[in-house]
Amino acid sequence: MDIRRGVAEANGIELAYEDMGDVLHPPILLIMGLSAQLTLWPLGFCELLVKAGYRVIRFDNRDIGLSTKLSHLKVSGPVWKRFLRAQLGLPSPVPYTLHDMAEDVRGLLDFLQIPSAHVVGASMGGMITQVFAAKYPQRVRSVGIIFSSTNQPFLPPPKPSALKPLMSGPGKGATREQIIAHSAKFMRIIGSPKYPFTQDELIALATEMNARSYHPAGVVRQFNAILGTGSLKHFTRRIEKPTVVIHGTADPLVRPACGKAIARNIPKARLVIIPGMGHDLPPGVWERITH
């Protein structure tokens, strides 16, 4: 399958993207989550969508992968205060928010001269999708939200076993091998117990991601963008386009109740709960999601 790679000037920054399928076919824009490069939309998953008759675009969000790193922006103050405020649905001062990342999406579509697209977001990408679909309904044909949240008050937080490695990282001075091992361990913790990857597969994926880009400071800013935005509920309720919300029963990072909250707040949204799916996209769930 041919992949058209490029860098888009969007919202004052550069976004690396990959564009697949016939440019005359209906476009699907895939938005990935926290600390996740575009490669975490598996190529096989994208190929299924192309074979189904779609043009597929995946891209690196700001501060990740090959897109612009906003290293001049600094996060100040204790993160636990922002985390507690976020649990109450309250915003906090941060370098940028999910609103800025939604503007990146608009800029990418403008650059590619795509008037409207089917927009699918995973995790933080699903949060960006909610903001974008509410603010720019004319740019959205339909909405897909995978293991995400409204971030409204009193939703269950991540399990400590999933949150701890996300917050702590591999540690200062970690070697490349230690960084890769930490990434593989984290992917196993949040992964789908019904559709597990082998250790060799996880190490290979972590190695590929590390070789492409490693920028932990950008992940910190992305995480604070989530915390600083506050509740999305008032945006979620404004989504009018056909919407499917997909969540796994075994997600330890963004709990199933969070996906259910999204579906409750979007008129006529369809909720799909996948048994044994965690916070990843293993091949065993691709057919279910793409259909």
Sequence positions of predicted segments:
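N-terminal cap/lid segment of alpha/beta-hydrolase-fold proteins
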Residues: 1-14
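Conserved HGGG/HGGXW glycine-rich cap/lid loop of the alpha/beta-hydrolase fold
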Residues: 13-88
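Conserved acidic catalytic loop of the alpha/beta-hydrolase fold
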Residues: 86-95, 99-117
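Conserved hydrolase catalytic core segment
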Residues: 115-157
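Alpha/beta-hydrolase
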Residues: 158-234, 241, 261
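Short beta-strand/loop motif that positions the catalytic acidic residue
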Residues: 239, 245-247, 251
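Conserved alpha/beta-hydrolase "acid-adjacent" motif
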Residues: 252-258
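Catalytic active-site module of serine/aspartate enzymes centered on a nucleophile-bearing elbow/loop
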Residues: 268-291
